[in-house]
Amino acid sequence: FEDWVDRIPEDIQIIAGPGNHDITRLSEPQPRLQDDIFPRIKDYDNFHRVQNPQTVRLHGIESKGLKHLMYHGYSFDDHVDRIQELRENAYDEPERVMIDLLKRRHLAPTYGSNQLSPEGTDHMVIEEEPDVMVSGHFHSHAVSSYKGVNVICSSSFQAQTDFQKRVGHEPDPGKVTILNFENRKTEVKQF
């Protein structure tokens, strides 16, 4: 990962948040990844580690920047399992789960297999409407919008896993969404 980051120009900001396969606890919210995981790049000015979920403001458009709600999406599996309409096609259309969670204003609205950290505040509540919601747990690419919110599900760079084969899910690897912050239009690049 560090070798990959080294190839990215310094004027491009990198925001890294943990997911369910990373070296951190599974219960959410997940703390940001520790310094010792990235010994060479941890002090780079363009490398930022955040918790999961996290809302960040990026690039001061109209002096305030766009609010990006970043959430890996570990609760998606449990949520899909409990709602028939989502169960039928959510793995092929991951934006449907994300939009459903935006409607509910909660990232883990169903109690079940998703592990939540017992904290005084529910960090999974979507308190402020984001401008952009970004996720990636399903390893499938999707771009949509819901009531003015750009909904982006990142694919991964990993081929189909054994688990995905068992459940009949074909990931969509190597797709990256580029969002124009001024007009909110998206472009997809295949790598």
Task: List the predicted regions and their residue ranges.
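Extended recognition/assembly regions associated with phosphoester-bond processing machinery
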Residues: 1-191
